Structures are given as structure tokens and as C-alpha cells.
């Protein structure tokens, strides 16, 4: 039994050395950044969205044409 206790203590000590965690949490941090309203300058313009839409349409058309020619 004495040997088992020593082994258990060594295993727990190794686990404690390998593990790190934050113990104290401050309640004064508030809600954090995620709840804030962001006025991001990164907004897609209508022109760029239309360009992407047309690009997807053209690629879909190419796929349909390839399927037509490959089925013949």
C-alpha cells in the first residue's frame, strides 16, 4: 500500500506540473469585446458583391456547358 501511495503522489505531481490554468477570475472585466457593437470599415460594396455574383454565375454556366458536351 505504501508503494501505491508513492506512485499516486508522483502521478499527481506530474499532472500538476503539466497543467496550467487561471485560478482567479476578475468580475470587473465586464462583458468583453464580443458584446460591443462594431463599426467595421470592412463592408462589402454592392459593386464587389455583384462581381462575385456574376463570377459564380459564369462558372456555373461553364459547368453546365461541360456537362452538355460530356454527355454527348
UniProtKB/Swiss-Prot annotation:
Stretches assigned to coiled coil: none
Signal listed as a keyword: yes
GO BP term, example: neuropeptide signaling pathway
UniProt keyword annotations, A-Z: Amidation, Cleavage on pair of basic residues, Hormone, Neuropeptide, Pyrrolidone carboxylic acid, Secreted, Signal
Primary location class: secreted
Record-level Gene Ontology MF annotations: hormone activity
InterPro entries, per database record: Adipokinetic_hormone_CS, AKH/RPCH_hormone
Described function: Hypertrehalosaemic factors are neuropeptides that elevate the level of trehalose in the hemolymph (trehalose is the major carbohydrate in the hemolymph of insects).
Family statement drawn from the similarity comment of this UniProt entry: Belongs to the AKH/HRTH/RPCH family.
The protein, known as: Hypertrehalosaemic prohormone
Taxonomic source organism: Blaberus discoidalis
